[in-house]
Amino acid sequence: MAAKTDIRPKITLACQECKHRNYITRKNRRNDPDRLELKKYCPHCNKHQVHRETR
C-alpha cells in the first residue's frame, strides 16, 4: 500500500485563463516542493496556456 505522504503524488493542472482542470500528472515532492507550472495546450482556450498545480 502507498504511504500517506507519497513521494510522487497525483496532481491536477488547471489553466490559468479559463480555470479548467485539463491534465492529471505526478510529480516528485523532493525535486519540486513548490507548485508546478507548465505551458500546455488548453482545448477550451484553443491555444497553449500556463497550467498551474491545483490543491
Swiss-Prot record:
The keyword Ribosomal protein is annotated on this UniProt entry: yes
Q: Name one GO molecular function term.
A: structural constituent of ribosome
Q: Which BP terms does GO give this entry?
A: translation
Similarity comment: family membership: Belongs to the bacterial ribosomal protein bL33 family.
Q: Its domain of life? A: Bacteria
Q: Note the InterPro entries from the entry.
A: Ribosomal_bL33 (IPR001705), Ribosomal_bL33_CS (IPR018264), Ribosomal_bL33_sf (IPR038584), Ribosomal_zn-bd (IPR011332)
Protein name in the entry: Large ribosomal subunit protein bL33
Coiled-coil spans in chain: none
Q: Encoded by which gene?
A: rpmG
This protein's UniProt keywords: Ribonucleoprotein, Ribosomal protein
Q: A cellular component term (GO) from this record?
A: ribonucleoprotein complex
